[in-house]
Every structure is written in C-alpha cells, then in structure tokens.
Amino acid sequence: MHNIFAKMKNIYYIYAMENIKLKIARIEKSLSQQELADLVKATRQTIGLIEKGKYNPTLSLCVRIARALNKTLNDLFWDED
C-alpha cells in the first residue's frame, strides 16, 4: 500500500515537465488528441495540456488513458528512478 502512495506522488511530475511518453504512445496508436480524448471522455484541450505537462490529471483519467493506449500507468506517467 505504501508503494502505491509513493507512485501516486510521482504522478505530479507530469505537471512540471512534458509528458513525451504519452504523446509517443498516442502517436504509435495513430490517434489524434481528439480521438484519444473521445475514447477517455476528456477534451482535446485536456489531452494537449497533459502532453505539455501543464495539467495534472486525476488518477481516474490516467487509468482511462492507459487502458485506451494499452499501456500501464508506469509506462505513461511514473518516472521509475
């Protein structure tokens, strides 16, 4: 349980830096920001801001994005140091 809280804390790193992993995963799936947004019930603007590191998504949104891209949360959001 402690490990999940530590990882949840790390999710805030995407607020401070560009989330290139998310952008690459989206492009590999040949999805536009709008198409991904539609799949995860978000706006295109939200996806764009997450990719730029200017929006801190909820854990729920992170899970929906990861599922839509067939990736894990670790793959997209958590920096494994």
Placement of each model-derived feature along the sequence:
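Short, conserved catalytic or interaction motifs in soluble domains
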Residues: 52, 78-81
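DNA major-groove recognition helix of helix-turn-helix/homeodomain DNA-binding modules
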Residues: 60-75
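N-terminal flexible/basic segments that precede or flank functional cores
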Residues: 1-17, 28
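Short, Lys/Arg-enriched C-terminal cap helix and immediately downstream tail that follows
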Residues: 24, 59-60
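Recognition helix of helix-turn-helix/homeodomain-like DNA-binding domains
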Residues: 43-55
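Residues in the helix-turn-helix
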Residues: 35, 46, 75
